[in-house]
Amino acid sequence: MKLLSVCAVALLAAQAAGASIKHKLNGFTIMEHSDPAKRELLQKYVTWDEKSLFVNGERIMIFSGEVHPFRLPVPSLWLDVFQKIKALGFNCVSFYVDWALLEGKPGKYRAEGNFALEPFFDAAKQAGIYLLARPGPYINAEASGGGFPGWLQRVNGTLRTSDPAYLKATDNYIAHVAATVAKGQITNGGPVILYQPENEYSGACCNATFPDGDYMQYVIDQARNAGIVVPLINNDAWTGGHNAPGTGKGEVDIYGHDSYPLGFDCGHPSVWPKGNLPTTFRTDHLRESPTTPYSLIEFQAGSFDPWGGPGFAACAALVNHEFERVFYKNDLSFGAAILNLYMTFGGTNWGNLGHPGGYTSYDYGSPLTESRNVTREKYSELKLIGNFVKASPSYLLATPGNLTTSGYADTADLTVTPLLGNGTGSYFVVRHTDYTSQASTPYKLSLPTSAGRLTVPQLGGTLTLNGRDSKVHVVDYNVAGTNILYSTAEVFTWKKFGDSKVLVLYGGPGEHHELAVSLKSDVQVVEGSNSEFTSKKVEDVVVVAWDVSASRRIVQIGDLKIFLLDRNSAYNYWVPQLDKDDSSTGYSSEKTTASSIIVKAGYLVRTAYTKGSGLYLTADFNATTPVEVIGAPSNVRNLYINGEKTQFKTDKNGIWSTGVKYSAPKIKLPSMKDLDWKYLDTLPEVQSTYDDSAWPAADLDTTPNTLRPLTMPKSLHSSDYGFHTGYLIYRGHFVADGSETTFDVRTQGGSAFGSSVWLNEAFLGSWTGLNANADYNSTYRLPQVEKGKNYVLTVVIDTMGLNENWVVGTDEMKNPRGILSYKLSGRDASAITWKLTGNLGGEDYQDKIRGPLNEGGLYAERQGFHQPEPPSKKWKSASPLDGLSKPGIGFYTAQFDLDIPSGWDVPLYFNFGNSTKSAYRVQLYVNGYQYGKFVSNIGPQTSFPVPQGILNYQGTNWVALTLWALESDGAKLDDFELVNTTPVMTALSKIRPSKQPNYRQRKGAY
């Protein structure tokens, strides 16, 4: 493209001016909404124009992270996650609600304990985090059924359409959940500022009406009727314009879409496919919804990983810190005003809540690990970007222009996208034209500034863009009234402290940078080396040039101190808001941003507040760490770190410096091998004496499932009988006539499922599973049978969750689990009479604390023996490391004590060894919560983190395992251990354990 004409630049600048009312506060320019009509919608707190949201009258960039409370069933840990996201510079969290967990039985909505939303709202409010509520009814989310409860398989209507049967099925759930969300809205003093009806309503087939305005309007009306008054936003799966404002019935207030541009090939984490970097989002936005702020409701922050995949460490390497630099700054180049990163904390698919395409871990390669660590470099990189945006309110006033390979950079190897302001600052996003490039490219810039068009660097040398990197260069950037004419180094943050100002800049290793400040003052290097540093006055501007060094420099120009850092050093800096007390952190606003301080402190800084003459920091440490406070208020004299008064020194630049000594505690964990394991055969169904008279009969002549018609005399679809989760067991009775030689059975459990079949006590064989197979047809040869004798076929199926329902019209979620068809050679199918079971009670599930999906249909699960304190004293002593000598399923339980010192966040993991060739499957229960499904022959997961609150760090714990040997030689665990990673000295409040009801004899258990 050729250089933008003067007219084009002027047009962009004019658009950037907008028509907002503005006033000054602490050096910030606050932009208030200019349109009274949009202030008086259903509420006055959250409004918008074409550039951004306004919250409480202030223009605000929403930088958000996706978190699912149901994937961390310890409510007292939610604050920890919120504080770590707040520390990124973010101001919002988006969350799904999983319908399947709240309405396990039609008409019975239950949202208590771990499933209650109110504690999630309270934690968000305490951390100063706004919320975007996304309760569906459909969520996708890699959740079982896409969040749909299994009983929807029986709905006589097409899902996600205006079919009356489906709409009626959603009424109870949405009425309850939306009413709960409504109570948490900003209008009621809560954190919820946006509400999303439906999710990714973006594609259809099979003659379904689409897009169906009547359907979307129904979902919207459900929310509004329940009290939702905040703006409604949608999440289109691409820039398709579905339900955008102006499209008529079913339109939302604000249009948004998602994007996962790098894809999900974690097996090749270094491969960035050609052409995958978005380039048209600005044009798409102006086409689809030009009157609303540009909104990316889900932008890639990691990747899912299937059964048999490379693992989430590889996913974190795929969507890594380099990805963030290139892709997130590219999002900024389009003027993104609502940017939500999916996932920022992934969590765990505990208790069978995941879909068949994934395993127990939902780490997602996110910035926060599954165990809530912030040790991935991508977390630190994201903190640089988040705090830059937070400190740059003029970004929202700049108008994005077209990307170009000429006119700004002096090489076509680089592409520059301008965001031009009108006296409010401009931004220039630079990347490689071939975004996959790993070359280091030298360049100079031609920048339009208030001092004219300048070629940068002015003092000689060149800039460098390293491979898989991107930069945001600022022009006429306002730092509390001081004009930064330009900076090639990137801005981390800036602050005004009393009569001085601080600007923090950073660059990559070995880079050369230049800064120009519209001041006449002299330049002083007040800390660090003068080598490889030059400065010059050019008319009314001071120009400074330097080579990036690992050693910090502080340069003073007038009342402005400029911290020059390398990127790795910048990772250690934090910008906590300065709160009034320790009760809560304020929401992000111009005022709270202006009152923040800057802290250098390593692993994590959570909060800062003043009380009397003291400055109080709450922070976490994973090593001995130097601590510095930049901008301590003038009225404080004492420093407290995690409540302890700390001595400090004050240098000539007013920086407080001290240190925190780290000495890891000795963590003594029990040996799992040495526990007093008790054993129970949890497949008594194959014993000749077993009585299944109490079991539900599979006696339905028809199926209500509209997706798959019956091919059997009776339905064997598990959801027809209310069984939607975990292991299924079928028992088929027949009287032999002597001709039976084979049994064919087609079972379906979802990707990577397994099954085993017995005839009486004779093992016939197993399908050990493959990720590629959601169902499988097996043929088993029968032993010789005697005419007139009774026989029982026992079929065990490991179901892996219900399919998602992304494409409207497919009703894919209705794909049944269980036996799809069977044939007993020489006999009619009606010769077999079937019974089946899943979890005890099915939809009348027994454990209301752990929810409707947590347990399956094995004998020990039906009895509740997986819970603490089962009646195991008289059971046989046997270890899962000795295992089973033949096919079958064993149940093992043991107790152990932990004594983890308080004040330490110690991630714990149950690790399985895996060197045997025999296929086996394990379920891991911890204090009654199913926290792992291990499949030896598929993987990849062998390490299962379990959080404090599920594990009792100071007290007694119960661990239970189900071990399913699928092959004739049996199976045993190669190894099983409880391990920890680096203890973190934490300011985290005391963790309250989730409820862990003990075993009680269950009425009607069979």
Swiss-Prot record:
GO biological process, one term: polysaccharide catabolic process
GO MF annotations in UniProt: beta-galactosidase activity
GO cellular component terms, semicolon-separated: extracellular region
Residues annotated as glycosylated: N156, N207, N373, N402, N422, N622, N777, N914
Signal peptide: 1-18
Classification via InterPro entries: Betagal_dom2 (IPR018954), Betagal_dom2_sf (IPR037110), BetaGal_dom3 (IPR025972), BetaGal_dom3_sf (IPR036833), BetaGal_jelly_roll_dom (IPR025300), Galactose-bd-like_sf (IPR008979), Gly_Hdrlase_35_cat (IPR031330), Glyco_hydro_35_CS (IPR019801)
Annotated S-S bridges: C205-C206, C266-C315
EC number: 3.2.1.23
Residues the record marks as active site: E200, E298
Similarity-based family: Belongs to the glycosyl hydrolase 35 family.
Known function: Cleaves beta-linked terminal galactosyl residues from gangliosides, glycoproteins, and glycosaminoglycans.
Protein name per the record: Probable beta-galactosidase A
